[in-house]
Amino acid sequence: MALGLTTGAVHTELILTEEGPVIVEANGRIGGSVYGLLKRSHGYDMALAIAQTALGRRPDPPGPVQRRAAMIRPQPPVGRFRVAGVDDTILSKAFACADWGQADKAPGDLVDSDVGSTAALARYLVTAETVDALFARADEVTALVHQAFQLVPA
């Protein structure tokens, strides 16, 4: 309401400070991975729901959970590194274990843990029937991603 929006999708990012939460970003759109997470976990089409709302229709609510889903962007080790190489065989194996994945860094790229999530080596979406299976699958993919990237101090 503070932005004048009364319908549609919004994406707001907060940081928690000693003084309390602070809004750092407000967007008139859904957040980066929300569409894929809802589609894979509930079979829900968020884009359709947004379109229905824009047309003045009440969108159907998401149905029950069909699968557990997580979007993961593993952070690199603490410090400044350069990507010396990427083992495409291992990275392909990692992404074959995920529902979807992409590398965010390539050989020669600088990786600096101080810059936050833009330092992520890759991003991927995993799903599973149970929470335990989801965590196991996420751990497997994450381990392979870290094996695939060769980092050297920058």
Residue ranges, per PLM feature:
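Active-site "cap" helix and flanking loop/linker of ATP-utilizing ligase/carboxylase catalytic domains
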Residues: 1-12, 18, 27-82
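Conserved protein kinase catalytic/activation segment
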Residues: 20-22
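Peripheral (often C-terminal) accessory segments that flank ATP-dependent C-N-forming ligase machineries
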Residues: 51-154
